[in-house]
Amino acid sequence: MAEAAPETPPENESPQREPWEEWVEDVMEEIKQEALRHFDPRLLTALGNFIYSRHGDTLAGAGELIKILQRALFLHFRAGCQHSRIGQPGGGNPLSAIPPS
């Protein structure tokens, strides 16, 4: 019986993924800029200080802040943000391409 060739892992030919910390920093910057367009900077500073007091300068704290800001922005848009084009005259409905069922 012939000896089986040793198993080797497949070559990873996909591009190198961005390190997790850099990704979190990028997301934080994007969501911060969006939040500053819609909320009072003093509120955002207070929220950042609160998260920092609970988590310090950690990835868990950054994740918590991202989660809270995403929810706040979602609710803000859902309530009818003046700056949002979604649901506004001339803004177009992004779901209009989907035929009604």
Swiss-Prot record:
It is found in: Virion; Host nucleus. This is Protein Vpr. GO terms for biological process: symbiont entry into host cell; symbiont-mediated arrest of host cell cycle during G2/M transition; viral penetration into host nucleus. The keyword Acetylation does not apply. InterPro entries: RetroV_VpR/X. GO terms for cellular component: host cell; host cell nucleus; virion component. Interacts with human UNG. Signal peptide: none annotated. Keywords: Activator, AIDS, Cell cycle, Host G2/M cell cycle arrest by virus, Host nucleus, Host-virus interaction, Modulation of host cell cycle by virus, Phosphoprotein, Transcription, Transcription regulation, Viral penetration into host nucleus, Virion, Virus entry into host cell. It comes from Human immunodeficiency virus type 2 subtype B (isolate UC1). Residues 1-21 are annotated as: Disordered. The keyword Nucleus does not apply. The modification Phosphoserine is found at residue 84. Stimulates gene expression driven by the HIV-2 LTR. Prevents infected cells from undergoing mitosis and proliferating, by inducing arrest or delay in the G2 phase of the cell cycle. Cell cycle arrest creates a favorable environment for maximizing viral expression and production.
